[in-house]
Amino acid sequence: MFKDKSTAYEVVIAGGGLAGLSLALQIKKLRPTTSILVLEKREHDAPAATHKVGESLSELGAYYLREVLDMKHYLTSCQLRKFGFRFFFSPEHASDITRRVEVGSKIFNPFPSHQVDRGKLENDMAEKVVTNGIDLLLGARLTAADLAKNGHSISYEHNQVPQTVSSKWFIDATGRNSFLKRKLQLQKELDHNINAAWFRLNATIDIDYWSDDTQWRSFIAPGLRRLATNHLMGKGYWVWIIPLVDGPTSIGIVADPNYHPFDSFNSFDKSMNWLHIHEPLAASILEQYRQKVMDFKVMKHFAYDSKQFYSSDNWALAGEAGAFLDPLYSPGTDFIGLSNTWITDLVTRNLNGEDIALRSLVFDHAHKQLFRGWGTVYRNMYGLFGKTQIMLMKLIWDWASYWAMPNLLFSNKGYINLDVMKFYASTNGIGHRFALLNENIQLLFRSWGEYETEPVCDHQLNVFDLAFLKRLQSEIGEQYNREDLVSKMESNMRLLEKIVAEIFRKVSTLIQGTPPDMDVDPYKINLESQADGTHMTTGGPNALPVDHAVRADIEKMWFQKVKARQNVSI
């Protein structure tokens, strides 16, 4: 796979996993003459169903692989089409899947995503890398990276023989033990202490067969539930069930140690015991395949950040070499697509003779801000996962905001368009408003969690019965010129403001007894009343009246009728 004996490259990428291979392909596609060397420490092809998190693609990551890297045909023919995300709440009915609130679609999502076997995907991408004239060296262990503005010196060992090459650019895609991050002391702690354990079974696990209730089964066509990324949700935890293309199934437990100590599930036997306690039906099914366990892995306190991602001194961190948040909603490949797109833009412009000093600063700041905003989706939220009504509203917001803004910007190259980014990041611009809306409503969910709410069960919900969610998902990938993109961003922001206002009305009426039709400023939502009994959320230039179409959609997932009682323990 290593064709050239060159000692000088324009780009050296350390790490031949998904991030490194896709970056090499993206750079080569945009600038075909670029000389690239990829160094990968594993000596052979990755095994099928290889032991990595990241089997489930969300829409942004799927767009990156399908459209940016031209892998649409490959993903359609060689991997599984994903039947979206599927959530099973109501943990009080963990022994009966038919009693749990089930949320997902009844048809394949309009914009497709996939379940991928990471071993197969990376092996096939490695072949594509070589076919495209990129040098890929397996069994290469990085030993040193001497960085200099006028050129880097990269040292590695191959077959126990020291080698050195020069490069104009050095990209670290070595994963969470990032060589470059340690060298430059860029490690940054993240206040999100969550642990995970996961294993693969050489067996097909189909939730359709967890009950013989024909009415429950018939909610969707046979076989489709299995193709979803299925989530079993409970207080302080979630469990994933993900199918892989050749038959195996990935099972994972992700939990907050404030509720579920890491040592209660940090071995396979402990994981099964934990499942018997918290997800007894799932445990009884999985017990039948105990002899078909392919592997087991744990990851303690998996979230981390970086002080910097990109530099005009011609280095960058790609994928998990930079930062990692949380596997919920499968954002891993999203961030690979985002970071690789920023890196590709910097590399190709620099190699073409352009000054990238400003762009590197803008992209680094954008990555940090996006990562910080994304973090509010997860931080201090695990205690709410067993509160079904809260989570239904959170799902609405998390899906709507993700499809309305990051997907729109990414698919239209907005994140690498300085004109668009200037508009997005301007004072009180869309970026600021988007971040503030997200922070406010995530805080609302946490505040709501301090109140007891009625248990919700016995509902099967089609997410695309909500017209605005169906529209936002179906619009992913639509292309706009600069003027129309800005207009679409504004339009989507107005919708998001209405969603926040309506969710707040429902919650405030439930908890505080406020009028259900009051005007609401979505940027000032607060469950606490002022001294005179009024609410700061009402009135002002940003206050919104009820939007009856948005209200009708949200009411399809609203089941609370009794006023909530305060209970500070969540």
Question: PLM features: residue spans?
Answer:
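Beta1/beta-strand and adjacent pyrophosphate-binding region of the FAD-binding site
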Residues: 4-19, 37
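Glycine-rich FAD pyrophosphate-binding loop
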Residues: 28-53
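Predominantly flavin-linked oxidoreductase catalytic cores and closely associated redox partners
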Residues: 46, 128-282, 340
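N-terminal FAD cofactor-binding segment of flavoenzymes
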Residues: 47-95
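Short beta-strand to alpha-helix junction loop
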Residues: 60, 106-127, 261-266
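Helix-loop-beta segment of a Rossmann-like dinucleotide-binding subdomain
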Residues: 97-118, 153, 254-258
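FAD/FMN-dependent oxidoreductases across multiple families
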Residues: 235-237, 243-245, 259-382
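C-terminal helical "tail/cap" subdomain of flavin- and related membrane-associated enzymes
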Residues: 347-570
